Amino acid sequence: MSQSDVVSQTFRALVESADRKFGRVRDLPLHGNRSQNHHSFHKVFKAYMRLWKYQQENRTKLVESGLNRWEIGEIASRIGQLYFNQYMRTSEARFIVEAYVFYEAILSRRYFEGVKVKDLGVRFKELRFYARFLLVSLIFNRTDMLNLLVDRFTHLVDDCKTNFRETNFREWKLVVQEIVRFMKADKAFTNIRPLRYCAMFDSHPTSLPYVARFHAKKVLKFKDAILTSYHRNEVKFAEITLDTYRMMQCLEWEPTGSFYPKRPVVFNDHSGASIDHSGASGVIDMNFAADLTDPTLPPNPRKSVLYRPSVTHLIAVIATICEELPPESIMLIYLSASGKAGISNVSQLENSGGSKKSSNNNVLSRISRKQNSSTPEYHINGTKESSDYYENYLWFGPRGNGGPNNLYPGDIIPFTRRPLFLIIDSDDSHAFKAERGETAALFLSPLRPAFKDQSSADTTQNGSQFTFFLTAPLQAFCQMVGFTSSDSDSDFYSDAEKIISTSFSEWEVILCTSTSLDLVWAQVLSDPFLRRLILRFIFCRCVLSLFCPPEDSEQYLPVCIPHLPVSVSPKSELVQSSVRRLANHLGVAEYFKCLT
């Protein structure tokens, strides 16, 4: 047996060993068992690094033995997939960076394109590579790369349909449609500012000393979050919906300006550039990942993103994470789903037999109500009797209206034994006013969205308005009043962001110096992510209270439990003045009562 044969056999054995380990890690649950997951990841990562190093050291002999370029691309793709899966388990930024580095190298070195392959199996590998790279670029917020990948991916699917006419590529066409729809829904105002926590926008020098000095009797650390949404026909890509994507981004750190360098995306298929594709090059600049990582930032809170979970699976994940939650920590649960009847948008409400009612100032969309409203009747103290914990619910199910698909307020009560920050975004969110047990922090969305332009009210096209306010308040404000990014330049929006930033700084001082701030809020105020959510809630509530007619206030206003101080209520002159400044700056003050 020649030396080349020995090298080839060793290489194949390493491939098989790594793939077996990869299969075991891929099938592990994404949630819980941190130590076990870390150990398993380390083993499979070590196997692939050994394989990668071996092919680099023996590349010439492997090429002589018939190694194809796409085989190197498949190994790199597996490593990228491994990193991405670990990112989804841990939310550690370095893993999404490493995944991006490997996928970008595959694309730039054209591992799947070096030879015109007519093998259907290889084409499917290439299609899967593009789909995975699209998801990584989306989460990594690489807009230029996304645009390039969508164009490449679309052409690849069309080429596969032409060359493999007997094969059905309908599923891949749906993938193309999904990403195009997602990017269309998320493209407005994308250049204003990142959704992630950014020191430039979210750390306010004026109020920083007050935040630094603030100390409650008990301080909780934000460690874990569960994010899920379940609506009919909602905007999504792969297993990431638009609402959960926005929340994911909102709960991560944005590196400082010197990081995430905007390397130009230049991969011209027809430029004639002298790129050597004759050999199976396996060199990837793994040091580039260090250039994309900001070592000054603390770790991201771990996020468990559930795609269309069953109620039993959702409860099981909550229980697992509660069990593993470190002492003196708090868990955030974000639930976006339709209420009682499984109605997910305004157009469905109107088709359900409801009557229309326009606002007095003709600003609000004509949002219909059901003649027999499902809004629960609450007692004077804003709560319900314990027998009502299982009367209203969120709806997690593909069809029908059966009990197994219903998540009741009472289902959450056992988990309030641990500190809980609960965000309910639903047309039946106020049912969770009945939630009892240990006191939890609650944000409950309005029962109805409010827009100047009725077409914007369709959550299946634009996502939830409440979630948008919590994750991108200026963009949500502009969408509500029908103000588009084409209406003005970047400096104009930068000034609008400064108005919001100044307001948030003022409100931070109020919260940090308030003597009436409930302990539930005080114990999380030191956390930058949760504090930012509180400030954005204050903004959202005041905006909607001034935008909506008073007789419909309960339908269109969000609720927080327990109450925040009166000094940051919608009736506060200081809070209203902030909305006034923003509305005047954008030239939309006539849409708000008491502002003109």
Predicted segment positions?
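N-terminal alpha-helical scaffolding segments that mark the starts
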Residues: 1-50, 56-57
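Active-site-proximal C-terminal subdomain of hydrolase catalytic domains
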Residues: 420-545
